[in-house]
Amino acid sequence: MTSPTAAGPTAPAVSAADGRSPLAELVDERSIIVCCGSGGVGKTTTAAVVALEGARRGRNTVVVTIDPAKRLADALGLQGLTDTPSRIEGDWPGQLWALMLDTKSTFDALVAKHAATPEQGRRILANGFYRNISGALSGTQEYMAMEKLYELHDESDFDLVVVDTPPTRHALDFLDAPRRLSRFLEHRLFRMLVAPSRGLVKAVNVAAQTFLRTVSKVVGGDVVDDAIAFFQAFEGMEEGFRQRAARVNELLAAPETAFVLVASPRRDTVEEAHYFADRLHEAGITVQGLIVNRVHPTFGGSSPPGGSSPPGGSHPAGDSSPGGPSGPVTAAVAAGTARRAETLAGTDIGGLYRNLADFQAVTSREQAHLAGLAEAVAPAPVAWVPFLRSDVHDIAGMDEVARHVFAPTPTD
């Protein structure tokens, strides 16, 4: 992946000297928070919770989802979302808005913005090739998400923009989209196709003409003609797109932008989170927070060095110990419970010990996975969110998650 960091320095991890949780500091101090992670880990809900916290802390906040499952509207208690920000009413000092990315509408607006004349814009928007690619071309959604992010940040009154990204491996395209667009606009073939004054036949060599004739036989001459007309109508606009992509790239790397990784205790999602953290590190981007959802509570654990860890809540930077009221459950603790269950086999209390042993075995494995992940993103702060009684589908459910994510850090 190409690094977007050349434009500016990476912000350091925040501290919690005043009793705020480190993640609450991100909400207070950053302009953009990007929630990343694999599918099925509660990332969409987490993005909504972060945005809600922004409103509760007095910020004018908008949350953007490009999640095709459209779960964000459910989490916010809305019937649906559109490409226009919708206000979510609530009794909080700030404002909360939400929208669903509409790739084609965003692309249309960008064309209209950079067209030299209204006529040029109309020709492109009416072009059959453009209508086909504007919502379906690979990478278009990712770039338009970045364009919407830039628009909301630079051309609106929002203090905080929270972005819910696609599942992990697609999110890498999301990060690299501005640079890929720039490379495309600089490609020699593109530059030849946008030069109507020289004519296509004069601009391309014999091999290219042969290729176009072959393509015409497969997809139809009208499709190729539309494509050529589109590129020629695009002439003069590429510099505006290129400059916009560069500014988006700078924004991703700016200190005001924070990347928060979302995961769950399952091995596959932890591996995905490791993968994404590694790719971010390669790009020179620091993970500013880790939120782990659906953490199993622990019973009968042993206290870790330096004290116990809560079953849910925010840990300061460097404290990566998932655990329960008595700290993390080690494999030795789980084995000890299993031996006691065998000793008491056939009794009611023995059955209870067997259930506890099975539970501890699960939590022991999960905690081993999570400890490695927390170490991989250190010194980023970590928040553990326990299993909840029901899925989050309204503001009340989001409040319950927020109590764990943004739990205040005790001060000395």
Regions found by a protein language model. Give the residues of each.
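C-terminal lobe/tail of nucleotide-utilizing enzymes
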Residues: 1-27, 209, 213-232, 242-412
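Nucleotide-state-sensitive switch-loop elements of NTP-binding domains
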Residues: 2-33, 41, 46, 50-242, ...
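The Walker A (P-loop) glycine that initiates the GxxxxGKT/S ATP-binding motif of P-loop NTPases
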Residues: 37
